[in-house]
Design a protein with these regions (language model features):
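Residue at a conserved register position within TPR or TPR-like alpha-solenoid repeats
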Residues: 52-55, 89, 123, 157, ...
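Structural register within alpha-helical repeat arrays
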Residues: 50-51, 85, 119, 153, ...
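Eukaryotic alpha-helical solenoid repeat scaffolds
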Residues: 1-38, 44, 183-301
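Structural motif corresponding to the intra-repeat A-B loop/turn of tetratricopeptide repeats
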Residues: 57-58, 92-93, 126, 160, ...
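TPR alpha-solenoid repeat register
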Residues: 47, 80-82, 114-115, 149, ...
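Short coil turns that delineate tetratricopeptide repeat
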Residues: 75-76, 110, 144, 177-179, ...
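Canonical positions in the second alpha-helix
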Residues: 71, 104-105, 138-139, 172-173, ...
Length: 301
């Protein structure tokens, strides 16, 4: 592969923020050996950062150190380079040393979000859940709009079977990114796991509303549910059954159960039948259709 094609390929990965480490390392090594990064001007330093991360990913720490040294020499007090140095340390140093390195940086600059998140990541890998939660809560008090931080907190709570707390963290995610149906689906499934079925069915229906192409009755009957819409209809079906089995079911969020439960169950059944009756290019989902048809045909209660 020529130097020019390697440069173009690496630039494409940077533009897409892709982390194809093997290919980046292979092309980046060619550029580094031929001194091509010097021709990139200011983009050359971004290239070195890209190659550093790829080298760490593929275990070529010698090349990572070579790139890091060039960056440190050029930007001796850069917070961005400090973060790269920390990531490099994580590959070989004990967690205690890495945590101290991050703590020293945060003591000098408590607003360094990247370093703070790396520290949280290391703490989680050590299994110190209490410390991770405390650190993450402090981080989110400072950087409330960090969606990844709230998702991390929700995941930690869920891993400890604290689904109510996980759902609370996800409500902040929905406030920050209300247009993302995947986060709404995650919140719906978390509500279902915490047995708040009225809230869960409401959120599953929200996912359907967000992912349907149109609200018209005609399209609703003719369109084929795909992707997370199918998953949301499964959620509606499951919630309808659980609510029907217990008429006195209480919702921790004080969400009222839907009055038209039977109609929702019938609609979910019809939508799932359509999804699993698809053919042609969309037919992959049709695998196991007989099992699905038998399941959805079961009585509501």
């Amino acid at each position: 592969m020529s130097l020019q094609s390697s440069l173009e390929r690496l630039a494409s990965y940077r533009a897409k923020n892709a982390r194809a480490s093997q290919d980046i390392f292979r092309n980046g090594l060619l550029v580094l050996q031929k001194g091509g990064f010097k021709k990139l001007g200011d983009d050359g330093w971004t290239f070195l950062e890209q190659l550093t991360l790829a080298s760490i990913d593929v275990g070529r720490l010698d090349k990572a150190d070579q790139c890091l040294q060039l960056l440190v020499d050029k930007f001796p007090n850069s917070p961005r380079v400090d973060c790269l140095v920390g990531i490099r340390m994580e590959a070989t140093e004990p967690p205690e040393i890495v945590l101290k390195y991050y703590a020293d940086i945060l003591e000098a600059d408590s607003a360094n979000a990247a370093i703070w998140k790396r520290r949280i990541s290391v703490l989680r890998r050590t299994g110190k859940v209490d410390k991770v939660v405390n650190e993450l809560v402090q981080f989110l008090d400072t950087f409330y709009t960090d969606v990844e931080g709230w998702l991390e907190l929700a995941d930690i709570y869920a891993s400890c079977n604290q689904y109510d707390h996980s759902l609370q963290a996800l409500t902040h995610v929905l406030l920050l990114t209300p247009q993302n149906p995947f986060y709404v689906l995650q919140a719906a499934e978390t509500a279902y796991t915490s047995e708040d079925f009225p809230l869960a069915i409401k959120m599953f229906l929200t996912v359907v509303d967000m992912t349907d192409a149109d609200d018209s009755e005609q399209l609703l009957q003719e369109s084929t549910p795909l992707g997370i819409t199918v998953r949301a209809w499964f959620g509606v079906k499951l919630c309808a059954r659980r609510i029907a089995q217990n008429a006195n079911l209480k919702s921790l969020s004080n969400t009222s159960s839907p009055k038209n439960l039977e109609l929702l169950d019938e609609l979910a059944t019809e939508r799932l039948r359509v999804a699993y009756s698809s053919s042609g290019q969309k037919g992959e989902i049709a695998k196991g259709r007989q099992e699905v048809f038998a399941w959805v045909a079961a009585p509501l209660a």
